[in-house]
Amino acid sequence: IIRMEIKRAMRGFKDVTPTEAVQLINKQDAIMLDVRESNELSQGSIRDSKHLALSVLKQRVDELKTHAEKPIIAYCKTGNRSSAACEILKKNNFTNVMSLKGGIEGWKTANLPMVK
């Protein structure tokens, strides 16, 4: 358990719950970054989120530079790809990046609003 916590701390980003994400959106104008593939978007997404699939994020990361000062919360279906997205963002000098714990599934479980 301690080893997992050390590894998590060394990543340079943290996981946030859906409730924490809502607070960051409301108080700090956080950007929700949907890193799912296009064919997954029909399942719904978080309002006003920016879509950049993980498969193209490295090539298109500059599109996020205008948001570099804001918190960026990456999400996917369950939270695995969003961690990889956070690593890419950190390597490109984004400093305030987070991963949505549980992904869009966690968001749904928390009964938070979505758009189709």
Model-found features: residue ranges?
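Conserved beta/loop motifs at nucleotide-recognition and modification sites
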Residues: 33
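Rhodanese-like catalytic fold shared by cysteine-dependent sulfurtransferases
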Residues: 1-30, 38-71, 77-116
